């Protein structure tokens, strides 16, 4: 059975991801106490079901401490994948304010007994980060701070479609003006390269469009930058594989995340295609984005 565990920070889009998995034919359960997961998987497998998606969050409390070992145990019997959703505290506060929802840890005891109850939303968010931090290393992380719901659904679809063998190498483009992705393992700043934005004909395009590609490919400094990044990754990738990492996210950032970072992320993904499980995504470029869609909530 394939089991997708969705976890992360409340307000980061777990419901959106779970709905996307339900649409893809998964048997979905929200807020399942972790101790019931092995029993549920056994029951559903016996009932002929082969796809299960479960959302687990900080409301599980102390049970989260047992999750790392449970994931290891389940992985010996099933194809287990963990999807960890995250977002900046600022984005989360804005979402809770707009939806008028209460954070699940609001009013719960603080980590320090002398403090009493968690009264502010920011305190509850930070406490939740502490509780679920141990699960982040097991899964593929997605920073939803600037994502629209339809883009998250698309990324979840790609996540379940990819092969789950060895290290998955993710190249992610982004714009520094919207912040560095929280899910990045390596961040490369390419803002020093010539910017197609200042060419009026190239400004409305992206790094996927041929005129922008031709512009950047012709610049020796761009080729040198990509060569340096490629050499660095070629040197250190074996160490990450030996460490049994499931995912490695390489973030490429320019000013707006539309031209230079998109082109370089795509080019590097193509160069590393022979490595096997290579994924590319563009956080801030206007690609496959319906402007009428709401941000993840």
UniProtKB/Swiss-Prot annotation:
Sorted alphabetically, the keyword list is: ATP-binding, GTP-binding, Nucleotide-binding
What InterPro entries does this protein map onto?
A: P-loop_NTPase, RapZ-like, RapZ-like_N, RapZ_C
One GO molecular function term?
Answer: GTP binding
Which parts of the sequence bind GTP? Answer: 57-60
Q: For binding ATP, which residues are annotated in this chain's numbering?
A: 8-15
What does this protein's UniProt record list under function? Displays ATPase and GTPase activities.
Q: Which family does it belong to?
A: Belongs to the RapZ-like family.
- Protein name per UniProt: Nucleotide-binding protein Bphy_0322
């Amino acid at each position: 059975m394939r089991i997708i565990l969705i976890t992360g920070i409340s307000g980061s889009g777990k419901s959106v991801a779970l709905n996307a998995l339900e649409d893809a034919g998964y048997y979905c359960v929200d807020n399942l106490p972790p101790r019931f997961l092995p029993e549920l998987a056994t029951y559903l497998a016996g009932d002929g079901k082969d796809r299960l998606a479960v959302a687990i969050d900080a409301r599980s409390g102390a049970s989260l401490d047992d999750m790392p070992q449970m994931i290891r145990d389940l992985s010996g019997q099933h194809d287990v994948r963990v999807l960890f959703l995250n977002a900046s505290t600022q984005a989360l506060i804005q979402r809770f304010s707009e939806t008028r929802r209460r954070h699940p840890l609001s009013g719960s005891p603080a980590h320090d007994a002398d403090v009493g109850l968690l009264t502010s939303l920011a305190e509850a968010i930070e406490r939740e980060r502490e509780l679920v931090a141990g699960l982040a290393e097991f899964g593929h992380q997605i920073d939803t701070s600037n994502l629209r719901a339809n883009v998250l659904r698309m990324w979840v679809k790609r996540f379940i479609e990819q092969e789950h063998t060895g290290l998955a190498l993710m190249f992610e483009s982004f714009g520094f003006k919207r912040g560095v992705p929280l899910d990045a393992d390596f961040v490369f700043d390419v803002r020093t390269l010539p910017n197609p934005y200042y060419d009026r004909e190239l400004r409305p395009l992206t790094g996927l469009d041929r005129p922008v590609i031709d512009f950047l490919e012709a610049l020796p400094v761009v080729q040198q930058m990509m060569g340096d990044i490629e050499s660095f990754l070629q040197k250190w990738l074996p160490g990450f594989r030996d460490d049994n990492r499931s995912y490695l996210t390489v973030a490429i950032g320019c000013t707006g995340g539309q031209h230079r970072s998109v082109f370089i992320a795509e080019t590097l993904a193509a160069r590393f295609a022979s490595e096997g499980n290579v994924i590319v995504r563009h956080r801030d470029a206007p690609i496959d984005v319906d402007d009428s869609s709401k941000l993840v909530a």
